[in-house]
């Protein structure tokens, strides 16, 4: 709560970024409890909260898709977790090559993605090309007084708790979600005309603000006492509606 940029947004009226961050943070906290303790009501709460994101702001639809992708990966049997995603990536590459990919996003419309461009119906069209905005991005994260020591401490914490990252499925999945968020921001700022937002330091930190909840939940999972790290294994009957009826023996 003491992060300077969050304090600034609390005092500003009309910006939805803080609300996106709040709802996403609550969803990820609920999902983390599902991953750690297999509480079905927390899984339902996470799904309901994430489903609200597109109604708040355009970026919410992107985070919804990222969450769905990671949540589906978590539900796959372990032997399929890399085979199936690899097949999906290959299929997407073929579709992109044929310039056929159109994705409907809630409250946004159809998004057409092809090599070299992204067209969002009724919103904008982006031509994909490299923009060298590494300097402003690093300044936003490390030099300007926006995030205290958050982005300095995160890499150090990952190195310190690397064994926990390898052992904890919850940490790995939350980390994957954060990586998908960072990848989306990389494409936006380094490959589209939105790079101007990074160069003049306007919207870049407002979008980074939406990544912070995932980072903080990931950090909280890593900092758990190893002695209390009793993650429950997933079972097919854990999710609501999938419980098998009791049988008399």
Name each model feature, range by range.
Residues 6-26, 56:
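Multi-pass, polyprenyl lipid-linked donor-dependent membrane glycosyltransferases
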Residues 1-2, 48-50, 167-194:
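Transmembrane alpha-helix segments characteristic
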Residues 1, 9, 31, 42-58, ...:
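Membrane-interface alpha helices of multi-pass inner-membrane proteins
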Residues 38-41, 77-83, 159-179:
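Membrane-interface helix-loop-helix junctions at transmembrane boundaries of multi-pass membrane enzymes
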Residues 19-36, 49, 214:
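Specific aromatic-rich, kink-prone transmembrane helix
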Residues 63-89, 165:
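Perimembrane helix-loop-helix junctions
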Residues 99-132, 193-202:
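Extracytoplasmic catalytic-loop and juxtamembrane helix elements of membrane-embedded
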Residues 72, 133-175:
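Hydrophobic, aromatic-rich transmembrane alpha-helices
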